[in-house]
Structure formats: structure tokens, C-alpha cells
């Protein structure tokens, strides 16, 4: 739970608090849209016309409609500026920070 949660929680909390519309892409390619109503260790509750419980293991990407400030006193360590938060990167496929893990 350590490092992964320290990035996820502040990011998802900021999206929830500020009611930022998000697009959530699932691993099977389906795109869901709405606002994050709530979340826990395993699921995100996404609200649009209905509420949907989306399991985190099925999520590929969460893309906010606008940038959000999600830093909570550097809880995630490191610089924090390399964290991808959907800043309208059209066509730019910037490598992940840990590029040796992606292929």
C-alpha cells in the first residue's frame, strides 16, 4: 500500500474535491466519463447520469478534463512534476518515469 497509494490518494482526492470531470479508460478500451464521487483501495465510484462502481484493476488511465493540484506536502516523494495528470498531451507519448518497466 505504501508508494502507490501515496500517489493515487491525493490525485483522486483532488479530482473528487474539485468535482473535475474525468475520462476513465479501462484496460479493454472502454471509455467512461463522469465525476469521481468516492474511492477506496479497490474501487472508484464514478457518477454521471448514474453511479458506477469501477474496479481499479480494470482501469488503464484516468484523464482529468483540466489539470489539478494534487500534491499533499510531497507525500509521494520525488519531484512530483513528472506525474501524468492529463495535461492535454495530444499525440505526445512521453515515456513513463520508470521506462524500464514499460514495453
UniProtKB/Swiss-Prot annotation:
It comes from the Bacteria. The gene is hfq. This is RNA-binding protein Hfq. CDD domains: Hfq. RNA chaperone that binds small regulatory RNA (sRNAs) and mRNAs to facilitate mRNA translational regulation in response to envelope stress, environmental stress and changes in metabolite concentrations. Also binds with high specificity to tRNAs. GO terms for cellular component: cytosol. NCBIfam families: Hfq, PRK00395.1. The lineage of its organism: Bacteria, Pseudomonadati, Pseudomonadota, Gammaproteobacteria, Enterobacterales. Residues 81-96 have a biased composition (Polar residues). It holds the Pfam family Hfq.
Amino acid at each position: 500500500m505504501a508508494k502507490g497509494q501515496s500517489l493515487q490518494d491525493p490525485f483522486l482526492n483532488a479530482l473528487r474535491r474539485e468535482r473535475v470531470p474525468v475520462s476513465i479508460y479501462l484496460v479493454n478500451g472502454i471509455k467512461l466519463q463522469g465525476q469521481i464521487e468516492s474511492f477506496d483501495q479497490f474501487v472508484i465510484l464514478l457518477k454521471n447520469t448514474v453511479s458506477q462502481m469501477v474496479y481499479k484493476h480494470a482501469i488503464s488511465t484516468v484523464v482529468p478534463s483540466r489539470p489539478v493540484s494534487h500534491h499533499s506536502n510531497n507525500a509521494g516523494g520525488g519531484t512530483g512534476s513528472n506525474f501524468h495528470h492529463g495535461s492535454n498531451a495530444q499525440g505526445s507519448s512521453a515515456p513513463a518515469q520508470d521506462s524500464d518497466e514499460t514495453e
